[in-house]
Amino acid sequence: MKNLYSNHKTGKKIFLFLQLFFLLGMLYTANAQVMVPFTQRTSQYTPTKKIYNVKGDFTMLGNTNLTLQSYSNTSPNNNNTMVYVDVDGNSIAGLGGSPTFNSSAATLSLSTENGAVPSCSRIIYAGLYWTGRADQSGTASNTFSVTKTINGTSYTKNFDKRKIMFKGPGAANYTQFLASTSDIYYPTSTGDYIYSSYVEVTDYVRQYGVGEYLAADMALRDGNGGGTGYSGGWGLIVVYENSKMKYRDVTLFDGHAYIVSSNTTPFDLPVSGFNTVQTGNVGVKLGMMASEGDVSLTGDYFSIRNLATTNYTNLSHSGNTATNFFNSSINTGGNNRNPNLQNNTGIDISMFTLPNTNNSIIGNSQTSTNFRYGTAGDTYAIFSIAMSVDAYIPEPEGVLSATNINGIPVTAPYTATPGQDITFKVDIKNLGTEAVNNTKIIIPVPYNATYVAGSASGSVFFTPLPTPNNVYFDSTLGSTGSIVWDFGTLPLPASP
């Protein structure tokens, strides 16, 4: 481990302060078709935290709760008869205590990057989203009733678009979650009746961990939903950390943007506040949830601005194309789903790595970018977007210790009397994943101590020497002055 040493004398023990500065930008968007403006989603436990700076990442999972009565990989949900997906075997009570009408499952898996053990990862945040279209005309309500016969018995459920039943790995029963009226969008006649809902489930996912999750009894209708069609499904976003993994800046944001097929105007979504690595390749991962993108209708796209130009690159992943981005595909890293359908009839959940060859899209030390989305033929609604970038997170460590009092070597605990000189040593180490630039240590002198003029010095035990590598006393910094060591770049150690 490389060390940097500074020695100075005062009449009292001095404490080390390493000042790090971060500026986090705000996310915003504005256009005529955004029913609910996109804002950064924060946890109820850390409401001011806009960016998750973690050794870790985010992941996504989810599924559809409606499918075609006559399933086909290429048929859309519009003007077709839809039926409930129900995979839990009617053995577990759902909404209202009766067997579930609709249910589907997906498995939460966490990364094994750099030898990370998923069971040792810590859940930082989990957010549950669900979406559906259950109305065609008139004035829609958040609640409605559906009657269904199961094993010869008739049941009636009073569905609520704000309610969902959720079941974690090993849980005996479903737990009901209720979204706030402001999370996210519940139209009565606009936006093609597509609703989107959200609730934080961090505590629940921490309790049950990795494994299969089921979501059931969403407010959905089966049957023929007309020209747009009925659809419905759910998705879970999880932010987690593991000490083995890379540093990343993770940003989550949601809203409700409705894009109608007749409007070909593109719309922009600026994102700022992350801070990418200073050198080397920048890894970028994107996640998204949307509703009503059809497999058979093309022309819809989602793009990102190139770093060096004002041009945009249309994005795609293994389950879609650049000219049919919203195509009812669920592409979340290969985790298990039940059912595991190619055509999810109006539900898109995507998680994929962006093509960033030679850092052409996101570069080193970049703090903002811009997304653009639009259509030339398909109608859809976006309600959740996630992004992670390889991050620059300085992780220096400073250890302050006294070496002698009045020239006599000492070890802790120390005892000094007024008038004695105390010599301190500051050990600085870089525990991060890359060099720390513009490093400066500022040590305020306590009000009851006096700096011994000319006593501060610095020794560097690596090559090449950093610049400016200057140790000095600044009498104007603080009420009694401060000792400053401005030595420039703190490199990575040769052996951590």
Residue ranges and their predicted role:
Residues 1-35:
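Bacterial Sec-dependent N-terminal signal peptides
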Residues 19, 369, 398-402, 424, ...:
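Polar/charged side chains located within well-ordered beta-strands of beta-rich proteins
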Residues 261-264, 419, 493-496:
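Solvent-exposed, conformationally flexible loop/turn segments
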Residues 289-293, 376, 403-405, 417, ...:
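Short solvent-exposed strand-capping/beta-turn motif centered on an Asx-Ser/Thr pair
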Residues 390-418, 444-446:
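Low-complexity, acidic Ser/Thr/Pro/Gly-rich terminal tails and inter-domain linkers that flank the onset
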Residues 401-405, 437-440, 444-495:
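A surface/secretory-pathway sequence property marking extracellular, secreted
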